[in-house]
Curated annotation (Swiss-Prot):
Homodimer. Its cofactor is Mg(2+). The keyword Iron-sulfur does not apply. Belongs to the anthranilate phosphoribosyltransferase family. GO terms for molecular function: anthranilate phosphoribosyltransferase activity; magnesium ion binding. It comes from Legionella pneumophila (strain Lens). It catalyses: N-(5-phospho-beta-D-ribosyl)anthranilate + diphosphate = 5-phospho-alpha-D-ribose 1-diphosphate + anthranilate. InterPro entries: Anthranilate_Pribosyl_Tfrase, Glycosyl_Trfase_fam3, Glycosyl_Trfase_fam3_N_dom, Glycosyl_Trfase_fam3_N_dom_sf, Nuc_phospho_transferase. This is Anthranilate phosphoribosyltransferase. The keyword tRNA-binding does not apply. Mg(2+) 2 binds at residues 225-226. Catalyzes the transfer of the phosphoribosyl group of 5-phosphorylribose-1-pyrophosphate (PRPP) to anthranilate to yield N-(5'-phosphoribosyl)-anthranilate (PRA). Pathway: Amino-acid biosynthesis; L-tryptophan biosynthesis; L-tryptophan from chorismate: step 2/5. GO terms for cellular component: cytosol.
Length: 344
């Protein structure tokens, strides 16, 4: 599809067909489109609004172009779209250690920051984790720690063609929405945070279209792409072929309604400090938001568990020291694996 005709169609707010979307995404991901053309496409899609069919088609292309990794099942991913502009610490990354410590295998798909002050990869590298691991090393992490981090550029090399356009735009784009949909381990259960409640049903439907068994898509009424401690959060749950909408408030689970001020960060260093504080057992707003979002993943991953029980499992995983142990064990393991591969 020629860029000129694509842009005219989007300017007139006409949706793209699945075939058109696949063609355009392929052009963006193979170097056929220039940075200016990619940026124009992304900006016009944002103005028009991405549809279920467009996102499903785009995710299918991205999955086809990805370097896939088979880590077995069941697995869960906990991920946010970003783009909420709130600059909270890396809650989903913190939750990954808690959920793994609760005995659930986590394949955490993440990247460096594009639209926030601290992406999951920025934080982990600050802490000393090695992210560029081979498939067998990633499997080793899952086997020993129940958790592996899948560094997006390694699994989605085609994304390099859109990196400059995204960074120059500096705004939330289609790719924020796609990131949670293209986990290279092809997880079947996911907790996905989105930056606006307007996107809940759309993303849940796309996940269902892509073969998800169970998902929780979450957005808070104060604009976080996760369960908030400062407002009610809305959930669209997909399970057994059905969609269900429900709400979560911290007070419903014995947690304090708190301002977000205490969990806003300016850097990966600050985010790391908060995460280590939570995993060490410190109380406060950071712990509470990690408990709520970890519970969402435990609830999504386990059959027949209530949200109350899931919060208790998250609390135990922190208070018995296992979440902190997981953090330190995985960090050391990635460093050891990296040294071994460098000596081969």
């Amino acid at each position: 599809m020629k860029p000129k005709f694509l842009f005219e169609q989007l300017l007139s707010r006409q949706d793209l067909s699945s075939d058109q979307m696949q063609e355009v995404i392929h052009a963006c991901m193979t170097g056929e489109f220039s940075d200016v053309q990619i940026a124009t496409f992304l900006a016009l899609m944002r103005m028009k609004g991405e549809t279920v069919n467009e996102l499903t088609a785009a995710a299918k292309v991205m999955r086809q172009l990805a370097h896939k990794i088979d880590l077995g099942n069941p697995l869960i991913d906990i991920v946010g779209t970003g783009g909420d502009g709130r600059n909270t610490f890396n809650v989903s990354t913190a939750c990954s250690f808690v959920v793994a410590a609760a005995g659930i295998k986590v394949a955490k798909h993440g990247n460096r920051s594009v639209s926030s002050r601290s992406g999951s990869a920025d934080l982990l590298e600050q802490a000393g984790f090695i992210l560029n691991l081979s498939d067998s090393q990633v499997q080793n992490c899952i086997n020993q720690c129940q958790l592996a981090f899948l560094f997006a550029p390694h699994y989605h090399p085609a994304m390099q063609h859109a990196r400059a356009a995204r960074q120059q735009l500096g705004i939330r784009t289609l790719f924020n929405l796609l990131g949670p949909l293209i986990n290279p381990a092809q997880v079947k259960r996911q907790v996905v945070g989105v930056f606006s409640t307007n996107w809940l049903k759309t993303i849940a439907t796309v996940l269902a279209n892509l073969g998800s068994e169970r998902s929780l898509v979450i957005s808070s009424q104060d604009g976080l792409d996760e369960i908030s401690i400062a407002a009610k959060s809305e959930v669209v749950e997909y399970r057994d072929g059905n969609f269900k909408q429900w709400f979560i408030s911290p007070e419903d689970y014995g947690l304090k309604h708190s301002s977000l001020d205490a969990i806003i960060v300016d850097s990966p260093e600050q985010s790391l400090h908060l995460i280590q504080s939570v995993l060490s057992g410190d109380s406060g707003p950071a712990r509470d938001i990690v408990l709520l979002n970890s519970a969402a993943a435990i609830y999504c991953a386990k059959d027949g568990i209530s949200f109350d029980a899931a919060i208790e499992e998250a609390r135990i995983a922190i208070d018995n020291g296992k979440a902190n142990l997981c953090f330190n064990k995985l960090r050391l393991l990635t460093q050891t694996l990296n040294k071994e591969s460098n000596h081969e």
